[in-house]
């Protein structure tokens, strides 16, 4: 699968749904694309394990909290991409923005509000991960075409909480789930591409994640 000129234009033309609501954390991420041997690839990182990081060990796109010095959420995404993986993104690399996403509600408040920005540099990036990154992978978007990669994931801190997920590399415990998977589901929907790795019912569960509520005791 290749995100070509027509798909890039569709992303450029899209007007994202931006919904400011109360959340514990406000963050922004960069979805960085490149053309690989077998189609479009996305840069993902596996976060280093750290007891103070709520996303410890998880697969994610480069990104992080919006800081006071950031001009806007896109500036946050660009800054975090450089700090975490050494990717120097410019204005020419920017394609567009996807819909804002929210994490689970914890005691009635969204855990995180994420702004999602898409970039496609026309050059090879020199990447240098920092201490926050355990591993990096250029993930072929075609992974989302293979139903065999799907499974039902149990939240590591609340086994009663299950959700659709996609296995990237079982030997490294690299799993695509929750917010990162929802971002790619939004990208597929924008491009009008079927995401064949998940059934329609599973995609419905994914869309409904924002409406699910958990207590803080269950996730701490």
Model-derived segments and their meaning:
Residues 1-61, 65-83, 87-97, 101-125, ...:
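N-terminal leader/linker segments that precede catalytic domains of diphosphate-processing enzymes
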Residues 126-144:
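Acidic, glycine-rich loop-and-strand cores that form catalytic or ligand-binding grooves
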């Amino acid at each position: 699968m290749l995100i070509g000129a027509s798909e890039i234009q569709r992303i450029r033309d899209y007007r994202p749904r931006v919904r400011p609501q109360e959340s514990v954390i406000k963050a922004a991420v960069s979805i960085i694309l490149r053309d690989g041997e077998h189609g479009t690839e996305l840069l993902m990182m596996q976060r280093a394990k750290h007891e103070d990081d709520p996303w410890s060990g998880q697969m994610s796109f480069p990104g992080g909290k919006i800081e006071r010095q950031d001009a806007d959420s896109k500036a946050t995404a660009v800054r975090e991409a450089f700090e975490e993986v050494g990717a120097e993104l410019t204005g020419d690399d920017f394609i567009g923005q996807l819909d804002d996403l929210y994490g689970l509600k914890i005691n009635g408040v969204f855990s995180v509000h994420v702004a999602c920005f898409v970039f496609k540099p026309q050059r090879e990036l020199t990447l240098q991960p920092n201490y926050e990154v355990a591993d990096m992978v250029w993930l072929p978007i075609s992974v989302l075409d293979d139903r065999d990669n799907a499974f039902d994931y149990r939240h590591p801190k609340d086994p009663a909480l299950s959700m659709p997920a996609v296995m990237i590399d079982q030997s490294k415990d690299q799993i695509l789930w929750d917010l990162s998977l929802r971002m790619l589901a939004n990208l597929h929907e924008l491009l009008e591409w079927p995401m064949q790795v998940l059934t329609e019912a599973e995609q419905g569960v994914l869309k409904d994640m924002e409406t699910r509520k958990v207590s803080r005791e269950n996730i701490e």
